[in-house]
Amino acid sequence: MGKIICTGLGPGNPDLMSVRSDRLIRTAAHVAYFRKAGRQGQARRIVDGMLAPGVTEYAMEYPVTTELPFDSPAYIDVLARFYDHWADRLAQVSQTADVVVLCEGDPFFYGSFMHLYTRLQGRAAIDVVPGITGMTGCWHATGLPITWGDDVMTVLMGHAARSRS
């Protein structure tokens, strides 16, 4: 029996990936990753050149991204079916082999894997490897500390405004 291993890739530079993530990716026989329709996918791009020959890839292609408002019933329904489908597929593969799911940043910080994680509870063995978040990479790139001493930091989620053509 295998398991589903979601590994955080960090902010986009393979040098900022954990040693454990690197090892899991290089030895994986099955790798899954999210992507927009017709694109390679950012997570897949980050690991380019790291995958073993003959690896089986599962491109989890989003059925919609920004075409519908994220809070509309149609968007919620389409994505729920998408995540249900991929939870089923990954659970099936994990019955006989490990599957490494690639996740940009950290899987539990606004990561798409969270939607699979909740659906896979009790159906498959799951392991999650943390990654450096994108925002952490950003503030380190500035060379300035983001907080000092008793500072409080708040993270707010936001979406880009839709184009008004």
Which residues fall in each region the model found?
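Class I S-adenosyl-L-methionine
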Residues: M1-P14, V19-S21, R26-A125
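Class I SAM-dependent methyltransferase SAM-binding "motif I" and its flanking Rossmann-like core
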Residues: G105-S165
